[in-house]
C-alpha cells in the first residue's frame, strides 16, 4: 500500500504584509526592493505550517526585540500560528551578503566580466547559505522548499537593509 504524496498546490503564501511599527518605512529604493521581494515570494512558493490543514496562507512579518516574527493566518485572517525566530543566526550572513552586493554593484561599473562573474558566484553562495539557515530555523515549524527559502531570505535581507 502506498501513501499518496500531499497535494501542496494550496500550501502557499498568497499575501505578505510587513509590520510598519517594528520594521518602519524606508526610502523609495528600499521600498521598491521590498515590493519586488514580496512579489517574487507570492508569485511562487511552498509554505506549509506544521500541523495546519492546507492553505493558502497570509504571512505578516515583523521584528520583536531580536526576533523575526512570522504571523501566519488563513486568507480570511483566521490565525494559524505565530513563530519567533532569533535574528542572530542571520546577522553575519546578511552583513556578508550586503558587503558582496556592494562589491558587485561597484564591479559592474569597472570590472571585467570574469571578475563580475566571480563576485556574483560568491553572492549566490552567501544567499544559498542564508536560505539553508532559514530552512533549518523553520524545520519542524513550517515546511518550505529551497526556492521559497531563497525568496524569504531575500525579503529578510531587504528588511535589514538600511540603505
Curated annotation (Swiss-Prot):
This is UPF0262 protein RPE_4483. It holds the Pfam family UPF0262. InterPro entries: UCP032146. It comes from Rhodopseudomonas palustris (strain BisA53). Coiled coil: none annotated. Belongs to the UPF0262 family.
Amino acid at each position: 500500500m502506498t501513501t499518496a504524496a500531499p497535494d501542496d498546490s494550496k500550501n502557499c503564501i498568497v499575501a505578505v504584509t510587513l509590520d510598519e511599527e517594528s520594521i518602519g518605512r524606508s526610502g523609495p529604493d528600499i521600498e521598491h526592493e521590498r515590493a519586488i521581494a514580496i512579489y517574487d515570494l507570492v508569485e511562487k512558493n511552498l509554505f506549509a505550517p506544521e500541523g495546519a490543514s492546507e492553505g493558502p496562507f497570509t504571512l505578516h512579518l515583523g521584528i520583536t526585540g531580536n526576533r523575526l516574527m512570522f504571523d501566519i493566518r488563513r486568507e480570511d485572517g483566521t490565525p494559524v500560528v505565530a513563530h519567533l525566530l532569533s535574528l542572530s543566526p542571520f546577522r553575519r550572513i546578511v552583513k556578508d551578503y550586503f558587503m558582496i552586493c556592494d562589491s558587485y554593484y561597484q564591479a559592474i561599473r569597472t570590472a571585467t566580466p570574469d571578475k563580475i562573474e566571480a563576485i556574483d558566484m560568491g553572492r549566490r553562495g552567501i544567499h544559498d547559505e542564508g536560505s539553508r539557515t532559514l530552512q533549518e530555523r523553520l524545520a519542524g515549524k513550517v515546511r518550505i522548499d529551497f526556492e521559497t527559502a531563497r525568496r524569504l531570505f531575500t525579503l529578510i535581507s531587504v528588511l535589514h537593509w538600511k540603505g
